[in-house]
Amino acid sequence: WHIVNHSEPKLRKELDELTKNIYQNNEMGFYIERDWFLKTSLMLIDSDVRFKVKNFTSEEVGKIQQQWSEIKSCIKETFIFIRRFGINPQSLISKNAVIPVVYWLYKKQTSGHPLYTTINLLNKNHNERSVISQWFYMVLLKGIFGSQADALLTSIRDVMKNSLSDIHFPLEKIIDRYKGSNKDLRFDDEYIESLLNIRYGEGRCRALLHLLFPEMNPTEVFHIDHLHPRNHFSKKYLEKLDYIANSP
């Protein structure tokens, strides 16, 4: 970052403005740091995604600057997209999970234009949005970006790069790529059992609901404790019920 900071004041200013714009825009509302934008940019120019000084050569920085207008637009459209399918700042437990989505929307062409230019048009790309959101919920639930994120981003990029002629986001290919590894996206019985332990207020709740009920309105606001008020399960309340039940 310090290379960009000192030698490219214009890009530094652009990054700061993008952070502010995404955070303050009601259609997005996510706080994204500069480092994330730079890592994403390295991903989009098909460079080494590891955040090291040697990866920010003048050539790499030049490519980012040359494509910055398109990169910036794609990033914003991606955050609008994930917000619309129900992800908010609390449920976005891995910002690295957004990077492959940005890559696909940037590289995939539809009718001669990058997919990010039309992904948020409601009369288009319904199936595409459905497949990408399914992958995203799976990734958040499985937490596969918790370690070795750079290696994972690189290998997912390889799968997507070889799938740009596919009709839709290569969900099945990505699942196949990681079968049997510690990044396996499949849900076995043991893992499904563990999902029952997701607690009230946990960021993964939303992702689980969407996988269970794909027809659910992504923008619906749920009041989780309406069925059984949460405060009725506090120790104090339960002791009160026990006292009433056992009173003579």
Question: Residue locations for each model-derived region?
Answer:
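Intrinsically disordered, low-complexity N-proximal targeting/linker segments that flank membranes
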Residues: 137-237
